[in-house]
């Protein structure tokens, strides 16, 4: 995989460099609530601009249905990128139309333009190779060189991620090079003991990575909504908690395999419960109760790991050499259910281990709960991408850059 440093050595002055970034930031109306992904691509964009490239930044945001939708405009992200760069950034109101062409043609050396949301075009995400290829052709008309730096999208077989690199000289940006380097540490030469903390709502989303980690990890800590399927698999009542009954046989099999391989599965010993899901708009006090994890009352739902579990999980992370964390321990966006996630984040900071936060909600939680991002070994920008990499899957965006 050739990197941006090789491109810079070749020289980029006056060349149109297409940067496939991941500016898929959370918005409250037009206000960006977490600009982490924009800041993550800044080194690549800034270095190219400094070297005299005419930088064309493209990204998706959200899941519009292949047509323009103002709610998913990249205009706020483009404005924030300009603020972070300390420079004017042109914004095209379409992706491959008149506005995009004018924005790119208007660039002088060292200037940056951002195209409108790639997913406003059906060809970006099409499963039809010809339709996707035709859209990639139109994107290719706007550039001389391709730099892939949207790690959060490399697991998608989309036109800008997979098809476009085949049409242009292609290089990995700083972010993708860093992400791949870190994830290789977790797969090829991991320092032991290796602990993995997995949370999030659905166990079905994590089955692939658990299956793979049973061959790699020494200890797996489970939290979040997915924990209740594990508790049910052990024969416990889980009340009104989130439960994927159809996954219980697979979970039972994984628990048995873990025993056979000497992998320690750690489940909570207590949980915070309430009769209803909290009000996420008002964040009104929810007054949860703490109950034993194996004695959740009927009609009550578990919404975070409890105080004893927080201590247990912290103790399981103190004697590790490597920790990978993906997924919150509870409904961390509500203050009454944030302490489990906070405890895990603090345990990672306190641990002497090399710590990796696996993107998605975990990365958001680190920022929302006010932790210093530099206190962790690495915070990934790709939740789904990092999980699929750890599963050993071929990621289309990386395969395209290696081709």
Residue ranges and their predicted role:
Residues 1-403:
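Active-site loop-to-helix "anion-binding N-cap" substructures in soluble metabolic enzymes
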């Amino acid at each position: 995989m050739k990197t941006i440093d090789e491109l810079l050595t070749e020289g980029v002055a006056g060349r149109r460099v297409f940067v496939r970034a991941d500016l898929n930031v959370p918005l409250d109306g037009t206000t960006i609530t977490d600009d982490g992904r924009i800041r993550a691509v800044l080194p690549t964009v800034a270095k190219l601009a400094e070297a005299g490239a005419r930088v064309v930044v493209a990204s998706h945001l959200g899941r519009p249905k292949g047509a323009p939708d103002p709610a998913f405009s990249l205009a706020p992200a483009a404005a924030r990128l300009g603020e972070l760069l300390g420079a004017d950034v042109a914004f095209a109101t379409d992706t491959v139309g008149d506005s995009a062409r004018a924005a790119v043609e208007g660039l002088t050396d060292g200037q940056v333009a951002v195209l409108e949301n790639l997913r406003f075009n059906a060809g970006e995400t099409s499963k039809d190779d010809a339709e996707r290829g035709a859209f990639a052709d139109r994107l290719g008309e706007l550039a001389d060189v391709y730099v892939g730096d949207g790690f959060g999208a490399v697991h998608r077989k989309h036109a800008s991620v997979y098809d476009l690199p085949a049409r242009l000289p292609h290089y990995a940006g700083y972010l993708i090079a860093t992400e791949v380097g870190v994830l290789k540490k977790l797969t090829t030469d991991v320092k032991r003991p290796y602990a993995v903390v997995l949370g999030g709502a659905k166990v079905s989303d994590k089955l692939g990575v658990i299956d793979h980690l049973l061959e790699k990890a020494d200890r797996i800590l489970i939290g979040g909504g997915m924990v209740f399927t594990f508790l049910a698999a052990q024969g416990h009542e889980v009340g009104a908690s989130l439960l994927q009954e159809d996954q219980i046989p697979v979970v039972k099999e994984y628990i048995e395999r873990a025993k056979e391989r000497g992998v320690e599965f750690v489940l909570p010993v207590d949980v915070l419960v309430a009769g209803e899901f909290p009000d996420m708009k008002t964040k009104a006090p929810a007054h949860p109760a703490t109950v034993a994890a194996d004695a959740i009352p009927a009609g009550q739902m578990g919404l975070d790991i409890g105080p004893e579990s927080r201590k247990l999980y912290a103790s399981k992370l103190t004697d590790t050499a490597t920790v990978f964390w993906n997924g919150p321990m509870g409904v961390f966006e509500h203050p009454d259910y944030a302490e489990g996630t906070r405890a895990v984040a603090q345990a990672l900071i306190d641990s002497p281990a090399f710590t990796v936060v696996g993107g998605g909600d975990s990365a958001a939680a680190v920022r929302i709960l006010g932790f210093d991002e530099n206190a962790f070994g690495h915070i990934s920008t790709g939740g789904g991408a990092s999980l699929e990499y750890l599963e050993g899957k071929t990621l289309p965006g990386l395969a395209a850059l290696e081709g």
